[in-house]
Amino acid sequence: MSPLTQDIEELPRAVAFIDGQNLIHDATREFGYDHLNIDVKKLALSVCETNRWKLTETRFYTGVPTLQQNPTWKQFWDKKLFQMRLDGVQTIASKLKDRETQIILYKHIRVTASDSSIESQTLIDTSPCWVTDRGYCLDHGTVISQTVFTEKGIDVSIAVDAMKYALESLYDVCLMFSRDSDLSPAVVEIKNIGIKSQSKFLVATVFPSSKGSDYGIPHADLTIRIPKSMYDKCLDSKDYFRRKL
């Protein structure tokens, strides 16, 4: 065994748990990108190489629309996830949930609830009012109905898998590519698992950021802010919106 090979094998093992939509939103806010245009495994490798960790697995979680919900994005995600799997990434995809949202754009609106136990009332506000999903009927004003597709359970899946990997001692470093505070209890539990098993796990919250003041997941041991220079080195040049790559 060469000294270089031995040195690599002795590096702390890292597993990347990537919240796809969280990563996209941060990249959009910070760098102006409107879709997932990077090689996620290359990004995880870049983070590990910078910190002298050995990446042993990359797991990517996202919600995917159906053909009926959005055929364009369905095609994109089918091709993108297929390429990830070819690259050795473990992909975990879930269906998006439909949610009907109604928005009213008037300041003075008489609102009558469908539930007769609630009396009619006049709302006076200086900002647009949101109509809840409990069946309110509007006597006046324009109502805009819109179906939005929401992602459910991604944070739970990441939390469960990250804790399972800790119990099985499959990593030394848990890389959570997310800033979702809902993952904070899982971070605490991973640390507790480490204490009970006499193992020391390092949990890092990783996200694109151009500002040093951005906060990641509470209770994480380390915050890693990905600068645009690192992000851009991991760009994926393939066009997954085309019918044929």
Predicted regions and their residues:
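Nuclease catalytic cores that cleave nucleic-acid phosphodiester bonds
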Residues: 99-245
